Amino acid sequence: MSHYDFKAIEQKWQQYWKNNQIFRTTIEPSKPKYYILDMFPYPSGEGLHVGHPLGYIASDIVARYKRSKGYQVLHPMGFDAFGLPAEQFAIQTGQHPAITTAKNIGRYKQQLCQLGLSYDWDRCISTCEPAYYKWTQWIFIQLFNSWYDISLQKARPIDELITLFDQQGNQQVQASCDKEVSLFTAKEWQAMDEESKQQHLLAYRLAFLEDTTVNWCPELGTVLANEEVKDGLSERGGYPVIRKQMKQWSLRITAYTDRLLAGLEHLKWPLSTKEMQRNWIGRSIGAELNFTVIANGQEHTIPVFTTRPDTLFGVTYLALSPEHPLAKLISTGTQQAAIDTYITQATNRSERDRLADVNHVTGMFTGAYAIHPFTKQPLPIWIADYVLAGYGTGAVMGVPAHDSRDYAFAQHFQLPIIQVVAGGDTAQSAYEAREGSLFNSQFLNGLSIQEATKQAIQKLESLGIGKQKTTYRLRNAIFSRQRYWGEPIPIYYKNNIPYPIPAEELPLELPSLASFKPTPTGEPPLGHAPNWKTKEGYPIELSTMPGWAGSSWYFFRYMDPNNEASFVGSTAQNYWQAVDLYLGGAEHATGHLLYARFWTQFLYDLGYVNIEEPFQELIHQGMIQGKSSFVYRIKGTNQFVSYNLRHAYETTAMHVDIHLVKNNILDLERFKNWRPDLQTATFVLENGQYICGSEVEKMSKSKYNTVNPDTVVEQYGADTLRLYTMFLGPIEQAKPWDMHGIEGVFRFLVKVWRLFYLEKGAIITNEVPTKEVQKAIHKAIKKVEEDIKRYAFNTAVSNLMICVNELTALKCNNRAALTNLVLILAPFAPHLAEELWEILGHQHSIAQAPFPTYEEIYLQEETYEYPIAINGKVRAKINFPVDMPQGQIEEQVLTHESIQKWIQGQQIKRVIVISSKMVNIVI
């Protein structure tokens, strides 16, 4: 083979790896382990796009490098196959999700294999396989059968809580539980019937039913998480989302808030990700106090949580969340209609949107007043959408002088602003600094903020109207989805009380349905399943688990994927331990990464695993960006208006498949055939055409802006794609995809090939390498290894290119040097490396060969280029041998022609020579 035939080479070695099970992984106690994992993909579209391989290639480079350093490497891959993305794709294509998911998984595996990724495919898992989700259901049952002991800071079996209730009732039990729990004695507990006991236990279980306000999308027919809603629309599909009360399964993740915070300290994660989790958990220390309100002839108490009890005398109003139970109750008759309208509008916005929209102030006065606990002055009570029902008590005391959101609210509605902390000017903005002394504050006057905080809490406690409290922003995780394509929740109902399906009857398999589409009323598709009951005739839960259920523990299953007795065996878990390096997108910071930590800590508490944290080190690969196209739907219609005419209408931007667009012009017929709901679409055109909007953003299936890597592999080969993807820039940075530079990377691989082959055939010799060749190759060994260790893959590729250029210039065809070159190239371009390794005469795979060691002797420079400065300003650079005495350097510098012109006729006061650093002439 005289030319670089990448197609033949890549097919040959991919088949070789498969036939010889080169990447099959076993437990080797004599070797150190290394567990490297990619976040597994959703197989929800037509396959991978060029943005996906960025993290996969990076992890593969590290996996191959670690094998070459003597580690036993676990590097698996699987598929996050349940959930909304896969189901929506099935609905769009009119096929059953089981069919589309299986087809997409096959396509993904084919694409991953053709990239030369060194996965152990024997360990492949899919979250939609009954053998897998049997254990997802089993873990849910463990959550249902557990409670959290605050005194011990760990989960315990529910049977132990029952024993405590039998012995002492619940009055002394320190447990994470519902806010309102009825107290009972041991005797009262013992007198209860079974149904009453189960109802009480539900308030303590870590998996429990609750009435909660959710993001409901009628079009998608399901509840959405906050992160799945943007500007009141579903992130997937752009459908309207409303807020409504529903009975949902939830997981009591709030029990783990302090441990989730503490665990972050020891993780080698990006600081930004740790900060996102801290903010999402939102631990705040402050005080909770009660305000009395008399409205409509009745007295009520409004508890308020504040992190600034020192500013109590700056309160000028109270604000309730639109969802607050008193919002309607205390409203006066004249305000009621307007308040009802406002509450409806506000509650239909997601909490994320309400928090983010700092420039848009809205609110409604209830007509009622509360009494200030110290001044006894009346405080107007408002409803405001910047107050969230789930944080604190759902009510805030407005202190405009010292809180920016309160300040904006007070300015907008012309409410009083009373400054109580000295040091700032509140004429234009709130003074939020936590320094200064108190004034306008009665018994707190003259105190520092710290001392005033302490005194205010003591006063509240002495009056019996408040206490110190720690609160959290994190809510319990809603676990129900009113969809079909998910794990059935293994619960049945007896007299409306939930009970777990017996473990020996798992998996509770998802039944095959003729119609699996969601319903706008909220009735889950499983309601149409015939005989969806236990063998005793009890109805089974109709909701399914959310998309994140299967991904919350999958990293354990890779360790022991065929174990039928346990989700992971102790031998496998003891050897592989935690994931050493995890790669995936930063968008999962407050979702998957938090839930996986929660499930791991829970399983640790019950003794099923021996680690508390699943991922020791984390890398977020930057986005590979693509050019997106947009159409503009006129709200409430199926009509779309062209880009330059959109401002005349109230529209919603919607992503459209870039393959339906050419030069920003939409193919109308193909667009109407794209999805069933678009077949009746009409258009407002400009000059007879529909012009699309465009934007460079994340390449994503949901944005329909993906580019297929198959075309790149077909034209240039997988090794070129691997190298080019790494060469684009630092792994963590976002990078726009374009094909302009890929030709140069392909030429680099051709140049590597030509070190081994010319047209006449192989040209390898056994000659002793020259000093120059040794220097080039050992410098590359050192730099490439250092780059891999710090995940600087782009500079590693650059150093490989520099080395090959130097070897080409030196006309190197020496076996020893080229052997080392192939070894350091192998993690990046494994197919070509395998072929060249074979040409060098080796019988085994290069994947089993050790990484070369550089020798310091070849890195020592014989000369050094000295910068020559005159009065501190560099005027020239001259090379001298590194061992030349300083006197000789001084002599040659002063006589060098490039220096003579600067010192001619000048008196030289001193010459300072610093060996292998610089020379400075003082004149």
UniProtKB/Swiss-Prot annotation:
GO terms for cellular component: cytosol. ATP binds at residue 701. The keyword Aminoacyl-tRNA synthetase applies. A motif ('HIGH' region) lies at residues 41-52. It comes from the Bacteria. Its EC number is 6.1.1.4. SUPFAM superfamilies: Anticodon-binding domain of a subclass of class I aminoacyl-tRNA synthetases, Nucleotidylyl transferase, ValRS/IleRS/LeuRS editing domain. CDD domains: Anticodon_Ia_Leu_BEm. HAMAP family: Leu_tRNA_synth_B. This is Leucine--tRNA ligase. It comes from Amoebophilus asiaticus (strain 5a2). The lineage of its organism: Bacteria, Pseudomonadati, Bacteroidota, Cytophagia, Cytophagales. The gene is leuS.
